[in-house]
């Protein structure tokens, strides 16, 4: 399971930890990602998605059908 949101396409970023003495060490900023099941009324089935918190807000705002269509158009989801 890759750490990529299937709705927004968000993935981990690389940055620096900066100490008080301003030394920089590499670190990873991970996505707030979780697996959630949704009931897709148009297809009459359950769909399991790896989504971020921002992806969940997108689904709440647009609806599941519109969010999945948008993600498929952008290439984040193979549906």
UniProtKB/Swiss-Prot annotation:
Bridged cysteine pairs (disulfide): none
One of the record's GO molecular function terms: structural constituent of ribosome
Entry's Gene Ontology cellular component terms: ribonucleoprotein complex; ribosome
Keywords, ordered alphabetically: Ribonucleoprotein, Ribosomal protein
Keyword Magnesium: no
Family of the protein in this entry: Belongs to the bacterial ribosomal protein bL28 family.
HAMAP family: Ribosomal_bL28
Protein name, entry field: Large ribosomal subunit protein bL28
Organism: Parabacteroides distasonis (strain ATCC 8503 / DSM 20701 / CIP 104284 / JCM 5825 / NCTC 11152)
């Amino acid at each position: 399971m890759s750490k990529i949101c299937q709705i927004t396409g968000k993935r981990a970023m690389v940055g620096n930890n900066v100490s008080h003495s301003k030394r920089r060490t590499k670190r990873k900023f991970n996505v707030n990602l979780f697996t959630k099941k949704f009931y897709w009324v148009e297809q009459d089935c359950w769909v399991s998605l790896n989504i971020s918190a921002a992806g969940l807000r997108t689904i709440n705002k647009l609806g599941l059908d519109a969010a999945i269509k948008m993600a498929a158009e952008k290439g984040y989801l193979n549906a």
